[in-house]
Amino acid sequence: MMDFGFVDSLKGASKRGKNAVIAEVKVRSPIHGDLLRGRRIEDILRAYEKAGAAAISYITAEQFSGNFETLKKIVGLTDLPVLRKDFIRGRKEVERTAEVEAAALLLIARHLKERTAEMVDFCFEHGIEPLVEVHHAEDLVYAENARAVLINNRDIDRMERDGGSIDVTAKIAEKIRAFKVSGSGIGSVEDLLFVLQYVDAALIGTAFMMAENTEEFVQTVCGGEKMIEDVLRGLDFDKAYELAKTLPELDEIKIAAVLAALEAKGYGAEVIAGFAKGVAEKSKIEIGKVMDTCGTGGDKTSSINVSTAVAIALSTVHPVAKHGNRAVSSKSGSADVLEALGVRIEMDEERARKMIAETNFAFLFAPLYHKSFARVAAVRRNLGIRTIFNVTGPLTNPARPEVQIVGVASEILLVEVAKAMSLLGRRAVVVYGSGMDEVNPNSSTDIAVVNGGVERLKLEPEDFGIERCRVLPCSSSGESAERIRAVFSGKGLKEDRRLIAINFATALFALGYEDLKENVEIFEEKVQSGELARKLEEIACKSTSM
């Protein structure tokens, strides 16, 4: 059998990671009336081509204000294979279609019945791909020699006054062994992703023609990339890894669609680990053995920047490479509060190495070390919602810390992030403090110790030797900086002091200091001696003078 190009063009789109879509040029709809709305067919065609359609369809039937001359014009204007749709009854129409070099022709099995098979063969003889349309499973008996079958989700005998149901595709697709296309009633990306679970390609006309911005909508659907479909079906480690590496290459619309789809679907340890590996792969630096303290955020408590305060305090004991960013969905990110504390946040690898050598502290500003994700970062800011990057941020520190404290905002994330870090071979303590992504001074805190395996523990404020106290809200990075500075100077609020102290104690626990009460005492001694205030001043001065 000859290779006619129509099916192969659709298969090629799938191989390139795109959704295989036939975009229909449709002049009129029995329900919606004029679909051109003053636009030229040439403009519609250019929009389809530019947006990534794999093939073009045109209806020559008079009921849709189509004609044969326009078909000839379309074939001459595009390099994409063109499908002619009409109520074909005889061989003469096949010959006419071949004369204008259309690539494919629709044959409706319900109308042709027993003649369908001979018309399929006649199309092949004339170098045309026959696309046999079926609506009921009973129609399939007439399509046995077809290489490609279109499932029409509407009843063709009722024209378009049957609204159609994409469930038709789901019901009969498995009975078809040929290349499968679903058409009619596909009005959204969600509809497309649904039918693509059952078929190889989709034909869309009315939804494209009625879109406010046809090119943008077609681009989202055609180029919305198979990866969105993969996300909604579910990713494994390898697919999540490839997704993370591919994401920066997409345009903003597709990036937003992928991130939104990930949030809608949800993700577990394998996806978190694979995605984190893909993000971190291009950003590795060598600055020695360090620790990191980082939270995923999202706990809605709006507390001071605890992990940043702990990172500074911890640098009096062990080298710390704090990985962080500006706020995306919260009031104050680690970069924001460090800047408010007078610390230079943009340190390249050389400066970071010097800072570690001279102060035991360096800040690794995420945008500086993940430059390939700059467009992704812009999309995240515009979206204004939490994404998988919030969860994977602590796992993508370019310094590859030997041990980490990671705070998460839910018990589910505690389990999944701990498993993810185990999959990546990391050593860490993951904490969830009853609604906080920190150790909670007023309630229980669940922790997962990751060191080869994962061990679960539960801590109470009394385990640290402190009285329970509430967590005070914070309204800005400036306020957070003032309150951290006050604690380090021994003049801060007791609630802030206890909050930082127990999280510092847990960080020491991750380093092997097992007595939590003693760890709190170490913090208090450092406050009272002025060591923490001096350390903050040293970090700020060194960072700005380099």
Swiss-Prot record:
It comes from the Archaea. Its cofactor is Mg(2+). GO terms for molecular function: anthranilate phosphoribosyltransferase activity; indole-3-glycerol-phosphate synthase activity; magnesium ion binding. Mg(2+) 2 binds at D437, E438. Pathway: Amino-acid biosynthesis; L-tryptophan biosynthesis; L-tryptophan from chorismate: step 2/5; Amino-acid biosynthesis; L-tryptophan biosynthesis; L-tryptophan from chorismate: step 4/5. 5-phospho-alpha-D-ribose 1-diphosphate binds at residues 295, 298-299, 303, 305-308, 322-330, 334. Anthranilate 1 binds at G295, N325. InterPro entries: Aldolase_TIM, Anthranilate_Pribosyl_Tfrase, Glycosyl_Trfase_fam3, Indole-3-glycerol_P_synth_dom, Nuc_phospho_transferase, RibuloseP-bd_barrel. GO terms for cellular component: cytosol. Anthranilate 2 binds at R380. One of its GO terms (biological process) is L-tryptophan biosynthetic process. Residues 1-226 are annotated as: Indole-3-glycerol phosphate synthase. Binds 2 magnesium ions per monomer. Mg(2+) 1 binds at S307, E438. Residues 227-546 are annotated as: Anthranilate phosphoribosyltransferase. Bifunctional enzyme that catalyzes the second and fourth steps of tryptophan biosynthetic pathway. The second step is catalyzed by the anthranilate phosphoribosyltransferase, coded by the TrpD domain and the fourth step is catalyzed by indole-3-glycerol phosphate synthase, coded by the TrpC domain. In the N-terminal section; belongs to the TrpC family. This is Tryptophan biosynthesis protein TrpCD. It comes from Archaeoglobus fulgidus (strain ATCC 49558 / DSM 4304 / JCM 9628 / NBRC 100126 / VC-16). The gene is trpCD.
